[in-house]
Amino acid sequence: MAEPRRPPGGGGAGGEGLGRSRGGFTTKLHLSADGRCRPLSLVVTPGQRADCTQFKPVLEKIRVPKPGPGRPRKKPDSVAADKAYSNGPCRQYLRSRGIRHTIPEKTDSQAARLRKGSRGGRPPAFDEERYKKRNTIERAINRLKQHRAVATRYDKRRYVYLGTATPAALTIWLRT
């Protein structure tokens, strides 16, 4: 069996967090934020990568130090996410870690569940009041993108871009 061809030096554009689109190279910055719009964890991926594939890595990078001695806190009280994360593996991961979540159900999966009738199971719990707090992540992204270097990404390498986004996140923490 022939091995697929890879660019010399490994990685290629995919390893650098750059993805192809009609407009050229694009990047996604996946992050989690606390209730005060402060970033807790950052992950850089190519622009065409699906959001749900980075759900677990983003949550596993959360580390909030406790005041005084002790291990840092790694588990959030609850997670509010959009429909991109409304799939079985994401919900199962949250259930296994004991994290409450508010994720709306996609209309096509809702229709499939209803089509199955009683075998389709119960709909996932959804709290509209808690879901309204999901805009904190959008506001955190907007705060990060107030920094020109984060908004435009002129950096070619993933680690350089992450090194640009991390101090921007740090300034958000220091200002609030």
Model feature map: region roles:
Residues 164-176:
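Charge-patterned, long linear interaction tracts outside catalytic cores
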Residues 19, 153-162:
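Structural motif
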Residues 27-39, 48, 55-58:
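Short conserved beta-strand segments at catalytic cores or DNA/RNA-binding microdomains
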Residues 57-60, 142, 169-172:
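Generic alpha-helical structural context detector
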Residues 1-21, 33-35:
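Active-site- or DNA-interface-adjacent structural scaffold in DNA-acting proteins
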Residues 43-69:
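Active-site beta-loop-alpha junctions of metal-dependent nucleic acid enzymes
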Residues 48, 67-154:
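Helix-centered, glycine/charged polyanion-binding patches within enzymatic domains
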Residues 2-4, 41-44, 52-55, 89-92, ...:
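A short secondary-structure junction signal
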